[in-house]
């Protein structure tokens, strides 16, 4: 009897439980755009538990009825969106909103107002992609940028190449590497950027001060070196590039490996090694011009749409030989070098690098984090640290033989935060704050007078950028930025120099110590700078468009322009800064016209740059030292006008044959003194005929003609010097420019499929085919030797 009662009770419980599990709950959902909260019509919702599909209505809504207690498993997708996987707990009637990101697959690490992804560009810029960068794997940044019209270089030989944009270089050009502004004693003409170009997937050159996010002092422009784009999927890939060349009898090797996961985690590592011996001109060895270089970088992080972080480290070390004959002992050596057709010091080929030389090590660490806020925008916070160690060795004897004549250690810290308001598709804003601290230590134990003193530098900046799409054919961008720069230095001045430059009249309050023949002074300067830009783009029709931009930029004087005072050994000249130097102010107006159709692309870019308090250095006499007489180069200020035109023409002649032309012309005038500016690039034109055929293993061949005109517009800085050995006065001709020259170059490459996932590209390049003897106006060593002769390069590139 008891068993029957228990059995009946159990049946009742089961029946009641069954009724309690009736599936009567409803779930209502809404699909919206992550940025602006607008409804998404036609989104697909897959309910995995029920194996059922439904779609959202024109208000972005959907409903699932008759659900039971528990969890439902949903996959929500829409065209151009990343599929979203969610779990929803059901224990009552429930509603929830889901947001989808419409452009998640196009996310970029750095967004600027003028990038190659934007169809409507409001400023003049050019992008070099990975195929071009790979071809220059064995070269440096300055070499690869010469592929852009309007971009040239100012050289100290062939291994120290400093980029120049529309006639401006050094502190007037901002160089960004992986989102970090490079700080590596960029004030020196003979200081090449410490960047391994193999870390870049693309390089963007922005002409003028139209990228205020990076700085308000980019009077010349901005160079943005961007790393590989992270692929958010399970993948392992890499590449290796081996290049050998005859001129310098050296090689370059680069290898990279990247790993990423579908969860968004990634890591990649890259390394580069270069070794070259003495290079050759058409007639002789360029003694002591070898190069030893090594670089390494490591990057890891997490990349998701709503949040992520990145940790980056890079190390670059260069040992660079300086042409032996460029090291002069006195003014007579310089006169003899200028009057000689050949190098004055030629020895047999060697891999040895002796004094004079440079040893430079640069390390960079960056940590950044970003977080997206629904219906609002994206917050980014970044900290970076850089250490730059620079040694410059002179020909010395005795106990100082192996001691550097210049020993600088520069530490730079930077903290940046920005917020991008992008909830509205046709207008975005970005605001940001930047703070930086820099400490320079000039080792006093070199045995020579320090060229650059110890100093502490503090920077603070804030900016606002706006981008507006007016209609389908027009776009307007604007930006404004404020910076304050404070520098505190301690420096010794010879009392004779102090009085000679009339500092005793204006700066006696800076003196903090008396050391017999020298004053110890403590200069403290604060500079306030305003910068602004505006750009407009309009598409006239399918083939024609134009762009106009205006930029106001302000730049504080750099430490060299302020404090240089002594013999710069690697430059073999005495350099004198000016404590009275004030900010440069640039007003740049630019306009471009573009014509594009399937066969013809033509771009004409004009600019005019008016610069007040333009700081430049030029020779104006000689000075006797215990080592002999050396030319004296003074920093001066003037009002400068620079204007020019850059032309690009790409013509598809047939399916396989094409023609390209790049032409640049620039003129620089010293408006205050009614004369030409020094160190302005000569006009040049480059013509290339190319053949390509994808059916022949992606075969490419190009013949390039590069003609550089003689620079006839230059200031007369010649002066007479007394030569003791001949007891005569001789004209020191530092101003005359070299003759025009024409170079022919050839390159070809083809790609073979080694395996399913591995390709091998074989490339052959010949530069200066005719072994032409020439000297470039902007090569600082043009007084002492001819430029490079013929060079054969063989490159093997594996992609896996």
Tell what function each PLM region has.
Residues 554, 611-613, 617, 707-725, ...:
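C-terminal beta-signal and adjacent terminal beta-strands/loops
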Residues 199-201, 212-283, 289-296, 304-307:
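Outer-membrane beta-barrel translocator/receptor signature
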Residues 607-611, 615, 620-622, 628-716:
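Gram-negative outer-membrane beta-barrel transporters
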Residues 403-418, 461, 573-582, 588-589, ...:
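Outer membrane beta-barrel strand-and-loop segments of large Gram-negative receptors
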Residues 276, 282, 287-289, 308-367, ...:
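Flexible loop and strand-edge segments within Gram-negative outer membrane beta-barrel domains
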Residues 95-99, 141-144, 161-164, 176, ...:
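N-terminal periplasmic accessory domains that precede
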Residues 32, 44-46, 77-81, 91-134, ...:
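Short, acidic, small-residue-rich periplasmic hinge/interaction motif at the N-terminus
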Residues 65, 180-207:
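Short acidic/polar hinge/loop motifs at secondary-structure boundaries
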């Amino acid at each position: 009897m008891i068993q029957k009662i228990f059995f009946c009770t159990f049946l009742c419980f089961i029946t009641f439980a069954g009724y309690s599990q009736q599936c009567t709950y409803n779930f209502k959902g809404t699909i919206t755009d992550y940025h602006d909260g607008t409804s998404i019509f036609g989104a697909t919702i897959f309910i995995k538990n029920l194996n059922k599909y439904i779609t959202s209505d024109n208000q972005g809504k959907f409903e699932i009825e008759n659900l039971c207690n528990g969890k439902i498993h949903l996959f929500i997708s829409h065209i151009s969106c990343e599929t979203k996987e969610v779990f929803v707990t059901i224990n009552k009637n429930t509603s929830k909103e889901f947001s989808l990101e419409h452009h998640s697959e196009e996310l970029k690490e750095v967004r600027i107002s003028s990038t190659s992804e934007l169809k409507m560009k409001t400023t003049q810029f050019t992008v070099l992609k990975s195929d071009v960068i790979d071809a220059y794997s064995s070269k440096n940044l300055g070499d690869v940028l010469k592929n852009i019209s309007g971009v040239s270089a100012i050289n100290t030989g062939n291994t120290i190449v400093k980029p120049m944009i529309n006639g401006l270089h050094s502190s007037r050009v901002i160089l960004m590497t992986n989102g970090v502004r490079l700080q590596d004693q960029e004030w020196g003409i003979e200081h090449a950027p410490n960047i391994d170009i193999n870390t870049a997937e693309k390089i963007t050159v922005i002409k003028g001060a139209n990228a205020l996010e990076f700085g308000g002092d980019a009077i010349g422009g901005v160079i943005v070196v961007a790393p590989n784009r992270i692929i958010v999927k399970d993948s392992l890939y890499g590449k290796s590039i081996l290049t050998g060349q005859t001129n310098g009898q050296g090689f370059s090797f680069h290898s990279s490996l990247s790993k990423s996961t579908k969860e968004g985690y990634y890591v990649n590592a890259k390394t580069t090694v270069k070794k070259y011996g003495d290079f050759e001109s058409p007639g002789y060895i360029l003694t002591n011009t070898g190069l030893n270089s090594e670089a390494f970088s490591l990057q890891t992080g997490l990349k998701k749409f709503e949040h992520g972080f990145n940790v980056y480290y890079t190390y670059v070390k260069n040992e660079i030989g300086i042409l032996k004959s460029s090291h002069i002992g006195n003014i007579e050596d310089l006169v003899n070098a200028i009057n000689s057709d050949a190098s004055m010091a030629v020895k047999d080929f060697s891999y040895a690098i002796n004094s004079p030389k440079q040893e430079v090590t640069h390390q960079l660490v960056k940590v950044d984090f970003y977080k997206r806020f629904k219906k609002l925008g994206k917050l980014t916070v970044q900290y970076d640290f850089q250490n730059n160690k620079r040694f410059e060795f002179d020909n010395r004897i005795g106990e100082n033989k192996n001691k550097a004549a210049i020993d600088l250690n520069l530490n730079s810290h930077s903290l940046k935060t920005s917020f991008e308001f992008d909830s509205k598709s046709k207008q975005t804003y970005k605001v940001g704050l930047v703070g930086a601290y820099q400490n320079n230590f000039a080792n006093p134990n070199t045995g020579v007078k320090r060229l650059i003193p110890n100093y502490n530098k503090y920077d603070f900046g804030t900016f606002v950028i706006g981008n507006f799409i007016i209609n389908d054919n027009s776009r307007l961008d604007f930006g404004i930025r404020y910076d304050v720069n404070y520098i505190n230095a301690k420096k010794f001045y010879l009392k004779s120099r102090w009085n000679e430059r009339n500092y005793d009249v204006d700066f006696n309050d800076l003196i903090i110590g008396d050391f017999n023949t020298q004053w110890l002074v403590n200069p403290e300067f604060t500079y306030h700078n305003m910068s602004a830009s505006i750009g407009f783009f309009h598409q006239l029709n399918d083939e024609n468009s134009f762009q106009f931009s205006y930029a106001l930029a302000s730049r504080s004087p750099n430490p060299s322009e302020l404090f240089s005072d002594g013999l710069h050994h690697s430059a073999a000249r005495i350099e004198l800064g000016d404590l009275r130097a004030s900010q440069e102010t640039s007003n740049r107006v630019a306009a471009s016209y573009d014509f594009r159709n399937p066969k013809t692309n033509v771009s004409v870019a004009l600019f005019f740059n008016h610069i007040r308090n333009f700081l430049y250095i030029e020779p104006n006499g000689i000075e006797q030292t215990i080592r002999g007489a050396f030319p004296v180069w003074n920093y001066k200020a003037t009002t400068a006008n620079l204007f020019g035109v850059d032309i690009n023409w790409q013509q598809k002649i047939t399916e396989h044959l094409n023609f390209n032309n790049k032409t640049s012309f620039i003129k620089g005038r010293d408006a205050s003194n009614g004369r030409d500016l020094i160190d302005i690039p000569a006009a040049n034109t480059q013509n290339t005929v190319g053949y390509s055929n994808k059916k022949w293993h992606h075969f490419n061949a190009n013949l390039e003609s590069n003609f550089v005109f003689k620079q006839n517009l230059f200031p007369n800085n010649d002066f007479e010097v007394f030569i003791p050995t001949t007891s005569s006065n001789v004209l020191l001709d530092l101003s005359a420019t070299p003759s025009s020259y024409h170079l022919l170059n050839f390159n070809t490459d083809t790609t073979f499929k080694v395996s399913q996932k591995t390709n091998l590209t074989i490339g052959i390049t010949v530069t200066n085919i005719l072994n032409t003897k020439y000297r470039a106006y902007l090569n600082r060593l043009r007084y002492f030797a001819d430029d490079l002769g013929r060079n054969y390069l063989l490159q093997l590139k594996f992609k896996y």
